[in-house]
Amino acid sequence: MVVYNVTVSVSPAKSAEWLDFMRLEHVPEVLATGAFRDYKICRVLGYEDGGQTFAVQYVAWSSEHLRRYTEEDAPRLQAAHKNRFGEDAVAFWTVLEVIEEGPAAP
């Protein structure tokens, strides 16, 4: 399993607008590409230096799906995000390979 993790630092003045944008526009557009099976929007807890930090995790169907997404769709979607929020929502991307997962012991 491959997780495409996008960490975004959002200015306090734009946090609510950014969350609405992600929920109503951006995430649906990303999922519409067919590259991902699900997603999570997480708030990073802890020290916040002048804003809020979020992690958006998309679980790819496969490495090939993620490769196609990053080559064919990501540039357009990232540009739309940057055009809308500029320096008020600065993102960086990480690809994670899940090597093991399982349920908690009873």
Q: Can you describe what each PLM-predicted range is?
A:
Residues A13-E17, W61-E64:
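A generic structural signal for alpha-helix starts
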Residues T7-A13, V44:
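Short strand-loop junctions, especially beta-strand C-caps/beta-turns
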Residues V98-P106:
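Short, low-order "capping/linker" segments at domain edges
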Residues K14-K40, Q78-A79:
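Short amphipathic alpha-helical segments
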Residues C42, L96:
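Conserved S-adenosyl-L-methionine
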Residues T33-R37, Q52, V59-V95:
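An amphipathic, aromatic/His-enriched active-site/gating alpha helix that lines ligand/cofactor pockets
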